[in-house]
From Swiss-Prot:
Pathway noted in the entry: Amino-acid degradation; L-histidine degradation into L-glutamate; N-formimidoyl-L-glutamate from L-histidine: step 3/3
Main location: cytoplasm
Disulfide pattern: none
GO-annotated molecular function: imidazolonepropionase activity; iron ion binding; zinc ion binding
UniProt name for this protein: Imidazolonepropionase
Organism: Bacillus cereus (strain ZK / E33L)
Chain positions recorded as Fe(3+) binding sites: H78, H80, H247, D322
This protein's encoding gene: hutI
């Protein structure tokens, strides 16, 4: 007997088409079951089909979804989850057009967050991050990548990674940990970036042994780390058994996209300034282009990543919030979906695939997250919407009704609007 059976699902977005990364037309295709049903047993999906096909199934609880839509839990593959403080005091500077790198040079930007994170205890960081994770869950997210990077020293980086490990045990959202020690060059290492990178590399063997990080990331940008420094750093991390990511071409077209494809990074993120050659190389690789349009929007920039061109050229595109205290302080992945549709010229179908299937592959979770398929974890979202286009169309609010994580209700908005029923 099933534990739970969801019936009368108006649109069941299984996202279950071809295995692997979605490109071109596959990104613009959504497998939808009309009048669908999903069965759950011991936290795992055991039935996917129509209500007609579900007749005869028995369950301890049958939930009538009332014609509303159900999707997989969403995947946010790029966040800076664990940090201290906030940076609302920088809004005025940004409105005046002060460049981020100039704010950074004055001790603001990431350096402000670094100081706040250093001063916070691990428990304070955990409690703050739980608040943000609860919000992410309320927007339908069930899997999140979480970066360190607000320490720029060994003690604080360890503290962030240990906080993430504790959150993995204490919060229902699945977390994927990334070490971003190479997020900026500390003042004391100004002009000695290679020495700083070696210090960060020296931390990796113990980090691997303690399983505190799965990925290693670096901020490849003018005034931070060069393309060659980034490639060398990430290749050494790969030799130690880590998968790698890269903050690439966010501000200047340095060739970060090309570097990511060349070294086989799991993802290249931002890519606002990615060159035509970089896009071509990404299209011919298994590196996911994780686009972060919320950051461009919040920084009030005119030029967004060329998402339309990337998809047309065959790049596997994912979307993420880039949740962080400085350049994108939002947990709302649904807002990111809307911005991507309007500013990156992505279709609703492409947007949905970019926050489920491709985003799961960007963090090596393509075989366990992002699809509704028999045998996978029952990470499901019931939406207060009757078709998938409505969610990115009606922007600025959350359309989530209920979230199931591993078959258990992890979030519901007020009183549940669905009703129990028999089949």
């Amino acid at each position: 007997m099933l534990d739970t059976l969801l019936i009368n699902i108006g649109q069941l977005l299984t996202m279950d088409q071809e295995d692997g990364l979605l490109r071109r037309e596959a990104m613009n295709t959504l497998p939808v079951i009309e009048n669908g049903a999903v069965g759950i047993e011991n936290g795992v999906i055991t039935f996917v089909g129509t209500v007609e096909e579900a007749k005869g199934l028995q369950a301890k609880e049958v939930i009538d979804c009332g014609g509303k839509m159900v999707s997989p839990g969403l995947v946010d593959p790029h966040t800076h989850l664990v940090f201290g403080g906030s940076r609302e005091n920088e809004i005025a500077l940004k409105l005046q057009g002060v460049p981020y790198l100039e704010i950074l040079e004055k001790g603001g930007g990431i350096l402000s967050t670094v100081n706040a994170t250093k001063q916070a205890s691990k428990e304070e960081l955990v409690q703050k991050a739980k608040f943000h994770l609860d919000r992410m869950l309320s927007f339908g997210v069930t899997t999140v990548e979480a970066k360190s990077g607000y320490g720029l020293d060994d003690e604080t980086e360890w503290k962030q990674l240990e906080a993430t490990a504790q959150l993995q045990k204490e919060h229902p959202i699945d977390l994927v940990s990334t070490f971003l020690g190479a997020h900026a060059v500390p003042k004391e290492y100004k002009g000695r970036s290679k020495e700083f990178l070696q210090w960060m590399l020296d931390l990796l063997p113990e980090m691997k042994e303690k399983q505190l990080a799965e990925f290693v990331d670096i901020f490849c940008e003018t005034g931070v780390f060069s393309v060659e420094e980034s490639k060398d750093f990430l290749l050494k991390a790969k030799e130690l058994g880590f998968d790698v990511k890269i903050h690439a071409d966010e501000i200047d077209p340095l060739g970060g996209a090309e570097a990511a494809a060349e070294i086989g990074a799991a993802s290249a993120d931002h890519l606002v300034g990615a060159s035509d050659k970089g896009i071509e190389m990404l299209a011919n690789s298994n590196t996911v282009a994780t686009l972060l349009p919320g950051t461009t929007f919040y920084l009030n920039k005119e030029s967004f990543a060329r998402g339309r061109k990337m998809i047309d050229e065959g790049v596997a595109v994912a979307l993420a919030t880039d949740f962080n205290p400085g350049s994108c302080p939002t947990e709302n992945i649904q807002l990111i979906m809307s911005i991507a549709m309007l500013k990156l010229k992505m279709t609703p179908e492409e947007v949905w695939n970019a926050v489920t299937v491709n985003s799961s592959y960007a963090i090596n979770r393509g075989e366990v997250a992002g699809k509704i398929r028999v045998g996978r974890k029952a990470d499901l979202v019931l939406w207060d919407a009757y078709n998938y286009a409505y969610v990115p169309y009606h922007y600025g609010v959350s359309h989530v009704n209920t979230v199931w994580k591993n078959g258990n209700i992890a979030y519901t908005r007020g009183e549940q609007s669905w009703s129990t029923a028999t089949i």
